[in-house]
Amino acid sequence: TGSRFDASLEEIFHLITDTGYEGVYPSVFGEFPGSELANLMDNARGGHFSNEGTITEDGYRYASAVPSSYPSGAWYTYDDETCTYDCMNTEYIYWAMTSILGAQEEYCSEIRHEWKLCTKEKVMNQDPAIYNLLTNPEYKLPSSLPDGSYGR
């Protein structure tokens, strides 16, 4: 822990999301338009923004089309033009889960340009559907942050 954020948490979480949750529960955690996760993400972004005409080499993932500006009510406003639609989903689940687990509280001002719900309470109140999905015991998602004391 400490004041420095461990970036490996984000990268490991992305791998688990991309190859684990999506593979086991595609209709729920699929990173494509129409999955439960994607519908929740589109709501958090204030709409569905993607370039439907561009299909990546895997055949179903659509290239992202970040809007020139997000709607004023959006709380997920990731603006990396290189992030495809599936990538946007991965980032959304990362931001929501790490906020629920308490990893983002001290970074609220630093991440506000991408994610406005930096605490568990903010996720519960403003995006209750993603909170309910990520805390549903059926999916056995993390319930605490790693603390580096494995096997001790």
Features from the language model and the residues they span:
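Acidic/His-rich structured neighborhood in mature extracellular/periplasmic domains
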Residues: T1-D58
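Extracytoplasmic/periplasmic, Sec-exported soluble proteins
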Residues: T1-R4, T82-N89, K122, Q126
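Extended, compositionally biased non-globular segments
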Residues: H48-S109
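Pan-zinc metallopeptidase signature
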Residues: T90-R152
